[in-house]
Amino acid sequence: QLAREFIDNGEIGKILTGNFIFAFPGMQTCHPDPESWFKKGGGPVIDMGPYFFTTLVNLLGPAKNIRSRGLKFSNNRTYEIGPKKGQQFNVEVSTSYMFDIEFDNNAVVQGFLSFDVNNHCQNHMELYGTEGSMIVPDPNMFGGPVSLSKELGSKYQGQSDPTTSKYYENYSGRQ
């Protein structure tokens, strides 16, 4: 919600562009029955997309054009935990997606959602405006530090706590 306040206060000016990323090795690493995430109707867009897309709409307004490409890097996955550990299951859907989203305000944001990345620790979004840049924490976590930079090398760390925000009733960004 701190990101929403920064935008409302014009802290980074008019937002021109941005990017977001959620990269993860897949549900087979942490769930004993992950197959539904890899069947038709599953995948990273269905699982994580709503968090990132609703946050972007909350911060930038409606999207007017979206282009996407999905890729499936493997036809099988292996259970890594649970009673089926070591067994394989079929993958039916794309497991990595790249996005190009154009908003009504003419901002363009690129994104990447993936169940194919083994080691990544920067799940977040960045927005770049005419007066500065902002790093928004992973929307799936509903809070965390927001970094604001207005000139080369400068950063502001703020803690986004939904319970103290004037936007508390919409803390998940879904209204």
Question: Which role fits each region the language model picked out?
Answer:
Residues 89, 100, 115-118:
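Contiguous C-terminal substrate-recognition/catalytic subdomains in enzyme active sites
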Residues 107-120:
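Glycine-rich phosphate/pyrophosphate-binding beta-alpha loops
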Residues 65, 75-92, 98, 123-175:
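C-terminal glycine/acidic-rich active-site capping loop/insertion
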Residues 1-90:
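Predominantly a Rossmann-like dinucleotide-binding segment in NAD(P)-dependent oxidoreductases
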